[in-house]
Amino acid sequence: MAQSDVAAVWNPALRSDDNATPVPTGPASLEIDTSIEATTIPLGSPMETPHEYSISDIAFPDSDTAAPPQEAASPDMIDTEPLPNPDQIPARDEVLEAPSADVEATPEISYDHETPNLDAPQTEHAHDNEAMPLDDPEDQVTEAQPAQPQAEDSISTEATAAQDMDVEEQSSTPHAGDQDGTEPADTNGEAHSSHDIWGSPAKENSAEDDFFNQLKTQTKPIYVPPENESRFEEGVPLLDDSAESPVEPTATQEGQIDNLFTDDNDEDDGFFKAVQSSPPPDKSQPASHITRKSTFQVMDSLGFSLDSPMSDADPAAQEFDNALAAATTNNSVGISAFEEDPAAQEFDNVLAAAATDNSADKPSSEEDPAAQELDNVLAAATTNNSVGISAFEEDPAAQEFDNVLAAAATDNTVRKSSSEEDLAARWQAELAEEEAEVAPSEDDLAARWQMELDDDDDLLLEDDIGGATAEHAPTSQNINGATAGAAVPGLSSPFGTPQSSVRPGAPATAYTPHQPSTSDLLQGVPVPGAAPPANMAASADYFTQPPRPNVTANKAESFAERAKEGYRSPYDLPEDLTRPRRPVASHKPVVTQPGSTPPPPRSNSIPIPPPSTSMPPPPLGAQPDGAQSTAKVAAPKNFYEELPLPPPRPQSRPASSGRYTPGANAMPPASSHPPPPPANPYASLSTAPPAAAEAYSQPQVQQPEGLDPYASLSAPGASSGPAPPSATSRYSPKPPTLQAGIKPPPSPRYSPAPPPATAPPPRNRYASQPTAPPSQGVALPFQPRTSSPLAYHEKVSYRPQEPSEQQPSAMEQPAIIPPIEVQSQPTAPAEYSPIQPPEVPHVPEAVNMGSSVHQMSQQPMSPPRNQYAPPGYVDEFSKRIAPIANVPPAPVLPADDPTFVPPRRSMTQSPSQQTLGPRLSVPSVDPLQRPASVHGAGSPTKAVNPYAPAQMSAHNRVASQSLEFIPPTDDQQFDPLERWKGAPIVKFGFGGSVLSCFPKHIPRYSAGQATPKIKSTPGEVKTHQLSDWIPVPDTIARHPGPLKSKSKKKDLLAWLSSKIAAFENEGIPQAVYMHADSQKRSEEKILLWKVVRVLVEHDGVLEGSPEIQKSLRQIIFPHLQDVDSAQPYGNGLPSFSTAQSLDAPSRPDAADPQAVESIRNNLLVGEREKAVWGAVDHRLWGHAMIIASTMDKSVWKQVVQEFVRREVRSASGNTESLAALYEIFAGNVEESVDELVPPSARAGLQMVSKVDGHGTSKNALDGLDSWRDTLGLVLSNRSSEDYQALLALGRLLQSYGRTEAAHICFIFSRAAVFGGVDDPQASVVLLGADHQHLSLAALQDEDSILLTEAYEYATSVLSASPKPPLPHLLAFKLVYAWSLADQGRKSEAQQYCDAIAATLKATTKPSPYQHQHLYFGVDELSARLRQTTSDGGSSWISRPSMEKVSGSMWAKFNSFVAGEDNEAGSAGSAKAGDGDIGPFAKIAGTPTVSRSPSVSDIYGSYSAQPSYSSGPSRYQPNNQYAPTSSPEQLRGRSSLDSQRSSSYGFGFGQRRGSQEPSTPVESNMYQGGMLYNSPPAVGYQSTPPQTSYMPLAPVKEDLAPQAHAEASAGPVEQSYGSGSPYQPAGYGSFDQPFMNQVPSDGAGYMPPGVSSGYEPPAIESHPEPVAAPSEEVNEEEPAKKKSFMDDDDDDDIAARAAAIQKAERARKDREADEAFRKAAEADAQKPAPAKKSWFGGWFGGAAGGKKEDLNPNKPIRAKLGEENSFYYDKDLKKWVNKKDPNSATAARATPPPPRASGPPSRTASGSSAAPPPPASASPMMPPPSSRPPSTTGMPPPGSPAPSSLGVPPPSIQRSVSTGAAVSTPPSGLAAPPRPATSLSNASSIDDLLGAPTARKGAAAKGKKKGRYVDVMAK
C-alpha cells in the first residue's frame, strides 16, 4: 500500500478505503484479513485518525516502512495505508517453511498489503504477541523456530500465512524498517524499526530486553514517548534475526500503531523505547535472522518458553505458534476482508486490533491520536509481545519474533524492543496476507478506530492509555515475555490478527492495557482473549481475528466498535483527534469479535486448552491479543507466581488499552495456563489473558487491568497481581500487592464492550486480589466509557464470574473473564464457568475479547447472575450453573491464592460470595474491581458493589459460622436436631401479638485455643405486634363494618369504590392466575363488586327506575355508553342497522304458494297444529307463530324453539344470547341456557349438526362467554319468568367454575338461596366464593365475607322492604372478627362481636345457624378481647380500669345500701368480689363457691346478661369485674382452665362443675329457651360486659346445658333433679335467675353471694310471689329462703323441688285462713324488712304498721285479709291483691314471682317461692330436655309457668325474652325485663358478693341494690 495509505491506516480518518479492504492474497491472507477485520479499527476510529501522521513518520523513520507498522498497530486504521511493500519486508520464506495447518497458505504480503502482514503478525500475535508474524520472517521466524519450538509449531500451523507475511513484510521491510528503524517495535508489538523488522533481531532483542528490564523496574506508564519515537526513528528493527524478531512481528504491526502513537506522544515512544531498550527475556536467544517459522515452530517457541517466569521461551514460541496459527486462521479471514491490500489490510487489522485497544487508550491521549493510538497498540503489543519475546528467547529469531509478538499483544513495548525492521517484515507478511485477503474497508477501520477511541473515552487519557498499555505490556512482558508474545501473535501471526485486532478494534487492546478505560473494562471483563485465550489465539492477536467476520461485521461485533457504533464513520476523527464520549455499542463489537473470531481460534484455541498453564497450548486465535495474555498467560500463571511484582505503575488512567484491550492488560498474566476448555474461547476467554496482562503489568509497570466491562475487575486484577484497586474494588481493601501508583484500568463496567476476555481473569472484586495488582482492574465508577456498559452489564452481572477472577495471583488463573460477547458466541457458556476461565489465560486478547464478548453473551446463558444479589450467593449459583454452561470448568478457582480472583461469577457477585475460602484474604480485592466482578460487565452501578464491603463481612461470616459450639453436658448434646445450639422462637398470640426469642451466641475463649467457641443462651423475649412485621395494607377507605345503620352507607360506598379500583389496578389476582379463565374471572369479579355497589347505592333495588337500568347497563355493557352518547348526534339519521337494511332490501320469506295453500286448507279443516307444523316445515315462521299463539302454550314454545334453532342459531355471529332471550320469551326458561351451552356439551359430548354444518365450527363452551349479553338482554326485556332463566344461567355458570358471573345472575334473579355450606339448596354462601368446588378455606376470604355483608346490608338495612339478615353470615362475621383480632384491630373485632350478639338477641325465630358453637365462639372472642383490652396485656395482674374501679365502688355502695356488708353472705360475696377485683382475682383460688355463684349469676344473668353487663354486670363489683372479675372468678375457680376450655368448648364442663348449679340454670334458660335465639345473644352481650367469664359461662350453658345439668355437679342436676331443677333455674334466671340460679347453682355455691347482691330484687319479688301463689306459699318461701340462707352451699334442687311442691299445693288448694293469715303475717313481716333494706322500706315502716292494722282485716278479705288492701304501696298492693286486686296483684306479682321464687329458694321458703319457681321451673324443665331446641324450650317454659302462676310464666317469658333482650335490658330495663335485669343484677352482685342471699332482708336490700345497679346500668 502506499505510504499515504500507511498514514491513513493509523489515522482512520485519513485511511483510504482500499486499506480498509485489501484484497486477500490467499486463504492465509483471508484468514488474516478476517482477524484483521476483527481487530481492524474503523477508518474513522481514533486509531486510524492519528494516521494523519504517517506511520513512517511516527513509527518508522521511513514512511514506507512506517506505514506497515502503523497498519499493524491499527489494522483498521492502517488498512488503507500500504505497509512496506513485500519486497521491502524480507520475504518470510522461512516462516512459510512450516506453513501451519491453521494458517491457510498466506501469500506473501507486500507492504502494500498490510493486512497480510497483519495476518501473520496477528496469528503470531494471537498466539504470543502477534509479534512473530510481524518480525522479520527471515530472521525472526527462523530464530523463533529454533528458539521456540512451540512457537515454531504454531507458526508452522500458521506458517503459510506467517511466512508469506514475513516474506511480504520483508519485502515491505524497507517501509517498516524505515518507520520502525528509529522507533522500537515494542510500542505495539509491531515493528518499531520497520526498516529492519525482520532484519535486525539483535537490535530488537536489546530493545526488548531493555523494555522488559524497564517493565520490571518501572511502575509508571511504560510509554516513554521520546524514547519510543527515537527508537522508531532510529529504525531499530522490531524483529531482529534474534529470537526477538519472531516475537516482534506482532509487535511490528502494533509497533507501527505504537509508533504512530509514539509520534503523537513522546512519552509513549519513550516508554516503548525503554521497553525496546530493556532486553526481552527471550533476548538471550541468538538473534538469528527472523524467518517465518512454521506454526508449530512458533508454537514451540511460544510454548511457554517465555522469558517471564510464567513460561519458557519454548512455551512462548509454541504459544506464539498457536497464536500465529489462530492468527493465521483469523488473519486469513481478516485478509479476506482486506483482500484489496493484504499487507495493508492485515496491518490495518493488526492496527485495528491494536487501535481497538489503543483507541480506548487514545481517547484519553488525544493529543497525538496517531502516536498515542500507535503507542497504545504498541503498548498492548508490547505487553503481549514481552511475553512472546520471553517465550522466543531461546531462538533469537523465533524468540525475538515471539517477544515482538508478545510486546505487540501486551503493550507494544516489546514490539518496540523488537527491531522495527523485523516488525516491518512481519507487517509486510501480514499485510501481504491481509491484502491477499480482503482489506477491511476504511469505514470498518474507521469504525473500529472510533470504537477504540470511544472505548478509551475521555476518561482514558491518551497518555494514560499509552502509558497504561505500555506499562501493562512491559509488565506482562517482563513477567511473561512469552505470554505477551503469545498474546501478541495476533499481530504478527495471521491467526491472531483477524480475531484480536479486528474484534477489539485493536485486539491488542484486549490484552493491551494501554487503553485503560476500555481495555481495563475489557480486562475487568476478561478480554475475549482471556475467556477464549487458548481457543482464541487468533482473536486474541490484535491483528489476528480470522474468525471474526469482515471488518464491518467485526467492527459491529467488536467491543470497541460497538462502543463506537455511533462513531463508526470511516471519516470520523480518531479519538485522539475527536474524543467520542461513549458510543454504547462500541464495546460490543469487541465482544462480537470473538464470536466471529472464536471459530478458528477455537480450533486453535482447542489446542490451547491443554496449555492451561503453558502458553503454547493456548489457541493461536485466543492468543493474539488476548492470547498474549492467554498464550503468555500460561506463563503468566507461573508469571504471577514466579514474577516479582514490582509496584504497578500507577496509571494516570486505567490501563491504556482500549475497552477492547482491557483483556490485554490483565489477560496475558491471566492466561498463564490455558483454560481447560480452551476449545471454548469464550469460556477461557476471561481467564488467562487478562490475568497474564495484569500479572505481566504488575511486576513491571503494573499496567492497569484492562477490565472487561463484563469481566469482574477483580479477576483481571488478580491476574495482574497487586493491580491498583479497580473502581469496582473501591469498596474492598486493595490487594496488598496492589500498586496504588498504577492506575488500574477503568473498570469494564463503563465499557459494555465484551473485552472482558481481554482482561485477565476478572478478579473477584470480592475476593482478595492476587499480590500482583490487577492493573487493568481499576475501573472507577465515575469514569465514563465511550460506550454504555449497561448493554453488557446486566448480562455479566448475572453471569458467573470466570474462574480467572478467582485466579488472582497466578497469571494462569487470572484468566480474563470472557466479556459478554455481543457478537453472540453463546457457544462458550463454559467460558463463564468460574473455574474454566482461569484455564483460558492463553487466549489472545483479541480472541479473549471476542470470546469475552461471547462469554458476555454466554454468561447470560450461564446462570444469570443477579447483579443485585450478594456476590457470595450469586457466585455459588454461578459456579453451579456456570460450569454447566461452560463445559470446561477445568480452571478451578485459585483456592491456593487467596488473592485469586474468583471466577467471573464473583464479578457478578458481591464480595462476600467471592470471599469464599481463598477470598478470606481480602488484600488483593480491588474496591473498583469488586463492583466489576460483581456485575461482571463492570457497569457503573456494578463497579460500585454495594456488597463489596460485605466481602469482608462475608469472610467474617464464614469464620464465625465455622466456630464451634460448646456442647451442653446435660445430655442435650445428643439431640439429633442440635436444638441446644439455639434457634429463633416465634409465638403468635391472640390479638396480633407476637413473642419472639432469639438465641444469643456468646463467644467463649479458653486457654490454648486461638478461636473462641460459641455458647448459646436464650435471648430476650420480646413482644411485637404482627402488624409491625407484616403491615396490613391500608386501603384508601377502611371498611366501615359492622354495618348496623343506614349512616354507614356513604362509607360503605367509598370502601366498595376503593376496592373496585384496587382490583382494576392489580390485574389478575394470583389466586386465580392459574385458572383457565383467569382473565375472565378477574373481570367478572370486578363486575360483581360493581353490581353490589349499585345495589347499595340504590338501597337494595336493582330494577324499577331508568337510573338504575342505566347504571347496570353501563356496568354490564360499558361499550353501550358510547352508543347512548352518540344517539343524540344520530337523531334523524338512520342507524347503522337501518342503513344496512336499506342497502340490503329485506326479502320476505320465499312464499311457496302451495305451502300457503296447504296451510289454508289445514285451517279450513280446523287442523291448526298441522297447519303450524306445515308452516314450520316451509319456514313460514310468521304463519307458524301466529297460528301457534292461539294454541296451547306448549305448541308456541315448540315453534319458537324450532325457529331459534333453524333461523337464529344458524345465523352467523354471536346469536346465543338472542336465542336464549327468544327461548325465555317463549317460556322455555330452563331450556334457554341450552342455547348457550348445549346439553350435549354439558354431558361431555360434541354433537355435529348435519343441518347447519356448524356443529364443530366452534367450541361449544364459548357460549358461556355470552352470559353477559344474555343477562343484559333479559334485564332490558323483563318477563314474568325470566328470574328462573337467570337462576338456570347462574347454575350453568357455576357448574363451569364461573363463580362471580353465576353470583351476578343469582343477585339479579332475586330468587337465589343464600345459605350455609351444608345447605344443598344454597346457591350462594359468600359472594365471590365457590363453595361447591373449592375447599372451605375459600370461605374465609375476607373480601367475600365483606362483600356478602354489604349485600346483606343493602337488602336488610337499606331496603324499603327489608329482608331478614342472613343467619348463616353470623358465623363468617365471627371469623372475620377473629381475623381482625389477629391483626391487632381488637376494637373492631369487639364491635363485630357486639353486632353478632345484638343480632342473636334480636332474632325472634331461631335459625339452625344460630347454635351453641356460635354463641360460645362469640363469648370466647368477646371475653378475650375484653381481657386484652382491659388488662392491656397478658399479665396475671390485671390493670386497673374505670370499669373495675367503678364496679368495685358500686359493689361496695350496693352492699352498703342493702346492708349486706354485715351479713355473712354479703360479706362473703363482697370478699369474693374483692378477690375478683384484686390483682390476685385471676389467680385461682377465691372461694369456688363465690366464684361459681358469680358464674352462676353470670349465667343467671346470662340471659339478662346484656342488662347484667350493661348495668349490674358493669356496676356490680363482681359482675363489673365480670369482665375482669368474672373472668377472674372463672380463673379463680381454675376457671382460666374452664374458661379456656370453654373457649374451646372443652372446659365448659369444668366451669360448670364449679358453676354447675347456676350455669345449668342459665344454660337451661338460654339453651332451653334461647339456644339459637336471643338468649345466646343476650348471654353473649352480657358476657361482653362480664368479659370473658360471662361469655364463657353463657357459652358453657349454651353449649352443654344438658351436659352441665348432667355433668354439672351432681348437685346441679340432682338438685335440679329432672326438669324441676332447670325449671327453678330457668324460672329464676328469667324472673330472677340469681335467686333461683344461686340456689340452683348449688345452694351452697352462690346462695350467699347471690342473695346478698340480688336479693333486694328477689325480696321485692318475694312479697309478690308470696302474694301471687298464696300466703302460705309466701310463708313457705321465707322459710325456704332461710333454709337457703343456711343451705347456700346446699343444692338448690332439693329446695326447689320442695318449693315447687309447696307452691303447687299452695296454688291448688290455697291453705286455710290461718295459713293465709300466716302468709299475710309473714308478708307483713317481710315488707318491713324489705322497706328497711330499700328506700321503699322506709315507706314500708309506716306501711308495716298499716299492715299490722290490716292483719285483722285479712280474715275479712279472704286468705290474705284486709291488711293487704290497706296498703296501696307496691308492697301493699301486693297484699291488697289478695283482697280486691287479686288479678292486679297477680299481674304485678308476675314479675316478682321470679324474684320471689328466687328468694324463696334462697330463703328456703320453698313453699311460697317454690310455687312460682316450679311454675317457671316446670316450663324450664322442658327446656332442659328441650333445651337443645332451646327456643322451643323457652316458650314452653314460659307457657308452663302460667300454669301455676299465670303471671310468673309471662315473667319467665319476659325474662326469657329479656334473656334475649336481657342483654338489652341491662342498659334500659323494661318493666318485665327490669325485674329480670334487677334479678340478674342481683344475681351478679350475689355472685361477686357472696351468699348473703340467705337473709330476706338482705334479699330485699339486694333488691334495692339490684335497682341501683340497674339504674347505673342504664
From Swiss-Prot:
Q: Which domain of life is it from?
A: Eukaryota
Q: Which cysteines are joined by disulfide bonds?
A: none
Q: How does it sit in the membrane?
A: Peripheral membrane protein
GO CC terms of this entry:
endoplasmic reticulum exit site; endoplasmic reticulum membrane; ER to Golgi transport vesicle membrane
Which compartments does it reside in? Answer: Endoplasmic reticulum membrane
UniProt entry tagged with the keyword Membrane: yes
Q: Where is the composition biased (Low complexity)?
A: 526-540, 709-721, 1532-1543, 1725-1736, 1798-1809
Q: Which terms under GO biological process does the entry name?
A: autophagy; Golgi organization; intracellular transport; protein localization to endoplasmic reticulum exit site; protein transport; vesicle-mediated transport
The record's annotation in Pfam families points to: Sec16, Sec16_N, TPR_Sec16
Q: Where is the composition biased (Basic and acidic residues)?
A: 110-130, 558-567, 1702-1724
**What are the boundaries of the region Disordered?**
1-31, 58-294, 352-376, 469-873, 1506-1568, 1600-1763, 1776-1914
Which Gene3D superfamilies does this UniProt record tie to the protein?
1.25.40.1030
* Coiled coil feature spans: none
Spell out the residue ranges that the record assigns to sequence repeats: 315-341, 342-368, 369-395, 396-422
Kindly state which keywords UniProt assigns to this record, in alphabetical order: Autophagy, Endoplasmic reticulum, ER-Golgi transport, Membrane, Protein transport, Repeat, Transport
Which stretches are tagged as biased composition: Pro residues?
596-621, 671-680, 743-763, 1810-1827
Q: Where in the sequence does UniProt note compositional bias of the Polar residues kind? A: 142-160, 285-294, 512-521, 849-860, 1506-1528, 1555-1566, 1852-1866
Positions of the region 4 X 27 AA approximate tandem repeats? 315-422
Q: Does the keyword Protein transport apply?
A: yes
State its role: Involved in the initiation of assembly of the COPII coat required for the formation of transport vesicles from the endoplasmic reticulum (ER) and the selection of cargo molecules. Also involved in autophagy.
Indicate the family of this protein.
Belongs to the SEC16 family.
Q: Identify the PANTHER family for this entry.
A: RGPR-RELATED, SECRETORY 16, ISOFORM I
Give the protein's recorded name. Answer: COPII coat assembly protein sec16
Q: Which gene encodes it?
A: sec16
